[in-house]
Amino acid sequence: MPNNCTKKNKKYYHCISIIDMNNIKGIVKFKSYNNKCTINYKIKNLSNGKHGFHVHKHGDLSQGCTSGCEHFNPDNHEHGGPHSKIRHAGDLGNIISSNKESFGSITVNNLSCNPKSKCSIVGRMIIIHEDPDDLGK
């Protein structure tokens, strides 16, 4: 769940999510500006291959990933890939792990670290799925 969300200056917001579950550890950093969000991630001990990567609606961990509910979707769009014209705001595509590590960066529209935005990720769950995402296909 993104925490430590701060306004770095008058131009952008920044959030950090620490991952530490079932021996999978890592960090996901979000930086948002003008309705675009850049996500940098570094994950360790993740099985090799593609894994769906999403922001889910709720940050409730009481029942593990199940309590996170569906993908974050404030505009009620269909599921898609991170660069699809029509997509859930929380659709971040797939990350690829090799040698049990995954790191990279992605920039998407319609996500924000601003807690006042309808597209805010603050308090939501970040999930790295065991299986690949179909990107809405």
Role assignments for model-derived ranges:
Residues 2-137:
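N-terminal leader/targeting pre-sequences
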